[in-house]
């Protein structure tokens, strides 16, 4: 699903000859989805471990938002690379925003929030077209 939604958004950007296109948006969406799935699996593993070893329950902690927050800020730096200034005109802001939004979509897909990701992806595409 991340490949499809990221690809549709990236196709629109590439079709408009923007600095980040088809492959970039797929990789951002897919990468964010993978990170969120890894984080969710780590949380499950920690919970299982604390059930088996209750003596470590006060030491081990899990924070569902921590890794996702790092993805969101990291993608912001990637998007910043698409922003250019030429003769006083700033361009690439929409592409930067689409990269950031695509990363957020990837996180929601990886965590299984399809009911949020699908309408949000459609909304992003409508805004870009």
Predicted regions and their residues:
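Short, non-helical or kinked segments that cap or interrupt transmembrane helices
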Residues: 15-28, 63-72, 86-101
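Alpha-helical transmembrane segments and their membrane-interface exit regions
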Residues: 123-129
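Short juxtamembrane and helix-loop transition motifs at transmembrane-helix boundaries
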Residues: 52-62, 76-87
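Small-residue-rich segments of transmembrane alpha-helices in multi-pass membrane proteins
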Residues: 27-37, 97-110
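Alpha-helical transmembrane segments and their membrane-interface boundaries
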Residues: 1-59, 63-65
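Loop-to-transmembrane alpha-helix initiation sites
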Residues: 112-122
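C-terminal ends of transmembrane helices
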Residues: 6-18, 77-90
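Hydrophobic, membrane-facing alpha-helical anchors
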Residues: 47, 65-82
């Amino acid at each position: 699903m991340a490949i499809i939604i990221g690809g549709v958004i990236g196709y629109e950007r590439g079709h408009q000859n923007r600095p980040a296109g088809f492959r970039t948006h797929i990789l951002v969406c897919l990468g964010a989805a993978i990170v969120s799935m890894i984080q969710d699996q780590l949380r499950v593993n920690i919970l299982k471990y604390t059930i088996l070893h209750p003596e470590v329950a006060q030491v081990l902690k899990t924070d569902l938002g921590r890794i996702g927050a790092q993805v969101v800020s990291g993608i912001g730096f990637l998007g910043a690379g698409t922003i250019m200034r030429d003769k006083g005109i700033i361009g690439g802001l929409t592409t930067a925003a689409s990269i950031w939004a695509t990363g957020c979509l990837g996180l929601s897909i990886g965590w299984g929030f399809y009911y949020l990701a699908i309408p949000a992806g459609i909304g992003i595409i409508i805004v870009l077209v």
